[in-house]
């Protein structure tokens, strides 16, 4: 089975939905942010502070190179992984990419008490979310499928992705 790759903005539900899919299909979940944290031995917040976003993205791509070679896994990516076309190419070689979408206001509600997001640290959170979401949307729209996590519970979103994925797999 091709990998199920979840991408989308921070707070869109990638980790939560990824866990549900992995559990239901009894396959492994790989969270690329967690893999980057292992590489550096520090939180993403700290990585950005000490090494900067550029270094974070370089290591993220190395993680993508490694995990994209796996088969039959769920891969939950960082929200900015789609900004690098090479990452998308690698993930698509052995996977189907699902964009988990939620509007800016919903993301703000989900992240309101989360101070660990380096890209939302300075200035007005909603303005930053809108700006980043608008900048990334053309990249997200290039994914294979879009799932609106604002109108679906995590359980229903997971079921929808599984249903789409298994139908797609049966046609291969």
From Swiss-Prot:
PROSITE patterns: SHIKIMATE_KINASE. GO terms for cellular component: cytosol. One of its GO terms (molecular function) is magnesium ion binding. It is found in: Cytoplasm. It comes from the Bacteria. Mg(2+) binds at residue 15. Keywords: Amino-acid biosynthesis, Aromatic amino acid biosynthesis, ATP-binding, Cytoplasm, Kinase, Magnesium, Metal-binding, Nucleotide-binding, Transferase. Substrate binds at residues 33, 57, 79, 136. ATP binds at residues 11-16, 117. Its cofactor is Mg(2+). InterPro entries: P-loop_NTPase (IPR027417), Shikimate/glucono_kinase (IPR031322), Shikimate_kinase/TSH1 (IPR000623), Shikimate_kinase_CS (IPR023000). It catalyses: shikimate + ATP = 3-phosphoshikimate + ADP + H(+). Its main location: cytoplasm. Binds 1 Mg(2+) ion per subunit. GO terms for biological process: amino acid biosynthetic process; aromatic amino acid family biosynthetic process; chorismate biosynthetic process. The keyword Amino-acid biosynthesis applies. Pathway: Metabolic intermediate biosynthesis; chorismate biosynthesis; chorismate from D-erythrose 4-phosphate and phosphoenolpyruvate: step 5/7. Its EC number is 2.7.1.71. Coiled coil: none annotated. Catalyzes the specific phosphorylation of the 3-hydroxyl group of shikimic acid using ATP as a cosubstrate. Belongs to the shikimate kinase family. Monomer. This is Shikimate kinase.
């Amino acid at each position: 089975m091709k990998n199920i790759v979840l991408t989308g903005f921070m707070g869109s539900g990638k980790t939560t939905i990824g866990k549900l899919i992995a559990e239901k299909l009894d396959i492994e979940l790989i969270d690329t942010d967690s893999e980057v944290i292992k590489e550096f031995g520090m939180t993403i917040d700290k990585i950005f502070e000490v090494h900067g976003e550029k270094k974070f993205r370089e290591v993220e791509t190395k993680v993508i190179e490694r995990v994209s070679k796996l088969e039959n896994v769920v891969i939950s990516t960082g929200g900015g992984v789609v900004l690098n076309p090479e990452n998308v190419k690698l993930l698509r070689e052995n996977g189907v990419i699902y964009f988990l979408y939620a509007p800016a206001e919903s993301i703000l509600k989900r992240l309101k008490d989360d101070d660990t997001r380096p890209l939302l640290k300075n200035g007005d959170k909603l303005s930053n979310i809108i700006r980043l979401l608008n900048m990334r949307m053309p990249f997200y729209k290039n994914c294979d499928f879009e799932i609106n996590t604002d109108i679906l519970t995590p359980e229903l979103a997971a079921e929808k992705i599984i249903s789409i994925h298994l139908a797609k797999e049966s046609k291969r």
